[in-house]
């Protein structure tokens, strides 16, 4: 499953890039060839990019736990969500591998909706919150540094 995992990561990274750049949901869910070599993606991952998660809505039945199915569950929730909380609840209520799918959803939705969209009680109950905030601050500072061409 390693080649599929790598392709899913490539696709997700392109989507996350779009979200961090402030793009709308349609642009996030369909990143263009400037960010991704679409033709090189394995067929199951290309179907995700083409919106298979819209046609194959995740169910509460037992999943195969494959990376493509997890990505589809997260993207389906993101596509339908109106806020951060609603999408998280949709993913966790699927039951199978919901922790992983919710983590994937949370990255994308957090980048799209912003930190203040995450319910305060959830943010305040994070374990090692200080370490997470410090690390996020360092990542942001690093991203803001001008890089030589």
Show where each model-derived region lies.
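Accessory "access/gating" subregions that flank catalytic or transport cores
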Residues: 17-95, 140-147
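Catalytic phosphate/nucleotide-handling subdomain of diverse soluble enzymes
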Residues: 1-14, 69, 73-149
């Amino acid at each position: 499953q390693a080649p599929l995992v790598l392709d899913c990561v490539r696709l997700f990274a392109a989507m996350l890039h779009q979200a961090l750049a402030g793009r709308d949901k349609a642009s996030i869910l369909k990143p263009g060839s400037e960010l991704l070599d679409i033709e090189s993606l394995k067929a199951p991952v290309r179907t995700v990019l083409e919106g298979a998660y819209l046609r194959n809505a995740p169910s509460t039945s037992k999943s195969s736990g494959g990376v493509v199915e997890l990505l589809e569950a997260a993207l389906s929730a993101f596509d339908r969500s109106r806020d951060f909380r609603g999408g998280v609840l949709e993913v966790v209520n699927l039951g199978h591998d919901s922790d992983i799918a919710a983590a994937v959803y949370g990255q994308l939705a957090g980048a799209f909706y912003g930190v203040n969209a995450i319910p305060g009680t959830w943010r305040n109950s994070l374990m090692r919150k200080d370490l997470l905030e410090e690390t996020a601050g360092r990542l942001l500072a690093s991203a803001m540094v001008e890089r030589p061409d």
